[in-house]
């Protein structure tokens, strides 16, 4: 059986999805000869496959187009494991991500050895369905196979799987402490099939970024998505009015994003046409944004400065940068205003907020008492989650707290902001919207204040409910279920053939008394004996069963996962 391992691209696909560093993701090869029996249907289906692969190789921005073509081929043959695998991968990129599960399970059931990362991908698909216990099982199975078979080129997946396992455990806790907030995508024409994010409410107008475009519009070389454009919309009586694209003087081939008001005339913008990406000041002249000077006290030559927020007082500015010396990929920094014309040097906000992973964006409340940011660290339940912390009396920011479910999801949740009427906005890549990132909004819930007799009622600041990261009672049942579901079985394979073997031929190979199990996988009839809980036990029986070329195979739930060549350290 010929197998093509396409590991590296898939790993980095899910690590770097939002960083713009993706290159060369590859799919599994779908053979024309084995695709379908009918000649005319075979040609048509394979034409869809070839076109899908060609588009996919351009960049992840074309993944939705590739997915549609793969699905057209799937209608002509729904049992090809490589095709089902490729459809699953495209769903994990283009969404809805939970739709990937059935295709990946189908691929794995037909060919358990379809790909070295199949259980990692199945784990992701379960995770996006909020089925965290089954996701953990498959992430652990992925680790087990890497360790068992000593796949050196896949060692990078071990810490990534551990990270996903921890996120799934966080997710179970957060789901168990979910709030009653009902979230809906913002109404009107704001959201589209493309990415919409970074909602900023200035005066009476909602500004937001979108990567929508027409087929012939220019695309970013990083990911082959359309460049970010700035739009605005005014709210009518019952819904948002038609959107309007904001013009600027930087040209078309640039990402352009508005963040915060700097002073009475100028606003803080991000532009990708300077270095790795810098923050600029700009002001509106008639119907066009005129880009001014780069913010020199923030920008560095070799780093990317993105996301900025300024409280109403104007005496601080918070921003995100990937400059050297931080705790992780991107950290949150701040500068203080020292005079009308001078700002302090950037200071890292510290290790209680920044993590070894990635902080993506930042927002400070108008009164400067609350900080919101997205992070892949802390107790995130998947990708970026949104966190908040309060400024203490001594001016230091308190411990970050996860905003909880349903504000956060198992997908990426980013770019939180608030307006002056007590409504919060954020962008999420979760399913249920129009596609990609969609913008959601909801009224900030009023705090519940209990009446205390004979004592004054204290005014509590308006906050969004937060969720504690600890809840032992919720974790107990899923943990037991997790232990049950991750049960592995080792067997000894004594023979394999393309055709069903005669009993006498099997007896000539194996003369012992163990029951022989017959399994048909990917065109091969495989014969195994024994059920052992550890590799050591199985290997001992393999060496004593009398079949010289016997070997140990790992099973889970009746499925053959692959060869087991050496003991797993956990045993």
Language model: regions and residue ranges:
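Structural marker of alpha-solenoid helical repeat scaffolds
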Residues: 76, 110-111, 145
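Canonical positions in the second alpha-helix
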Residues: 73, 106-108, 142
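Extracytoplasmic
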Residues: 485-487, 498-571
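Short, conserved micro-motifs composed of acidic
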Residues: 27-47, 86, 93, 114, ...
């Amino acid at each position: 059986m010929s197998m093509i391992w396409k590991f590296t691209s898939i790993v980095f696909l899910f690590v770097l999805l939002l960083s713009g560093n993706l290159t060369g993701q590859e799919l599994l090869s779908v053979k024309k000869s084995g695709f379908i029996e009918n000649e005319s249907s075979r040609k048509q289906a394979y034409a869809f496959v070839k076109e899908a692969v060609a588009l996919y190789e351009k960049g992840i921005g074309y993944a939705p187009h590739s997915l549609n073509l793969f699905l057209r081929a799937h209608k002509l043959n729904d049992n090809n494991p490589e095709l089902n695998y490729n459809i699953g991968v495209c769903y994990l990129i283009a969404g809805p991500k939970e739709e990937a599960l059935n295709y990946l399970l189908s691929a794995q059931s037909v060919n358990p050895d379809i790909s070295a990362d199949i259980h990692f991908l199945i784990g992701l698909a379960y995770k996006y369905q909020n089925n965290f216990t089954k996701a953990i099982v498959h992430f652990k199975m992925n680790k087990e196979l890497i360790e068992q078979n000593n796949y050196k080129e896949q060692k990078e997946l071990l810490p990534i799987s551990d990270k996903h396992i921890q996120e799934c455990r966080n997710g179970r806790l957060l789901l168990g402490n979910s709030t009653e907030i009902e979230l809906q995508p913002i109404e009107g024409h704001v959201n589209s099939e493309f990415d919409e994010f970074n909602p900023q409410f200035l005066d009476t107008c909602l500004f937001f970024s979108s990567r929508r475009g027409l087929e012939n519009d220019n695309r970013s070389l990083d990911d082959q998505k359309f460049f970010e454009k700035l739009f605005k919309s005014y709210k009518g009586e019952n819904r948002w009015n038609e959107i309007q694209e904001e013009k600027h003087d930087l040209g078309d081939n640039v990402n352009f994003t508005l963040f915060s008001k700097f002073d009475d005339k100028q606003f803080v913008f991000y532009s990708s046409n300077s270095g790795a990406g810098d923050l600029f000041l700009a002001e509106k002249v008639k119907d066009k944004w005129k880009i001014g000077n780069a913010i020199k006290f923030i920008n560095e030559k070799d780093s990317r400065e993105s996301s900025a927020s300024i409280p109403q007082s104007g005496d601080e500015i918070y921003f995100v940068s990937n400059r050297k010396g931080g705790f992780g990929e991107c950290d949150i920094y701040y500068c203080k205003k020292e005079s009308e014309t001078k700002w302090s040097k950037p200071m890292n906000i510290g290790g209680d907020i920044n993590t070894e992973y990635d902080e993506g964006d930042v927002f400070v409340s108008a009164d400067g008492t609350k900080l919101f940011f997205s992070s892949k660290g802390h107790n995130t339940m998947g990708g970026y989650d949104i966190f908040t912390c309060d400024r203490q009396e001594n001016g230091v920011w308190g411990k970050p707290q996860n905003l909880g479910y349903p504000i956060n999801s198992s997908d990426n949740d980013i770019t939180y902001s608030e307006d002056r009427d007590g409504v919060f906005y954020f962008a999420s890549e979760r399913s249920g919207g129009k596609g990609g990132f969609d913008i959601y909004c909801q009224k900030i819930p009023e705090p519940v204040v209990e009446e205390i007799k004979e004592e004054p009622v204290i005014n509590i600041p308006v906050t969004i409910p937060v969720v504690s990261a600890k809840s032992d009672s919720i974790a107990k049942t899923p943990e037991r279920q997790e232990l049950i579901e991750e049960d592995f079985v080792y067997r000894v394979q004594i023979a394999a053939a393309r055709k069903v073997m005669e009993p006498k031929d099997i007896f000539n190979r194996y003369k012992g008394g163990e029951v022989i199990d017959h399994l048909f996988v990917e065109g091969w009839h495989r014969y195994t004996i024994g059920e052992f809980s550890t590799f050591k036990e199985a290997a001992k029986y393999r060496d004593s069963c009398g079949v010289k070329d016997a070997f140990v195979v790992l099973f889970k739930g009746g499925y053959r996962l692959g060869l087991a060549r050496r003991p797993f350290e956990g045993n």
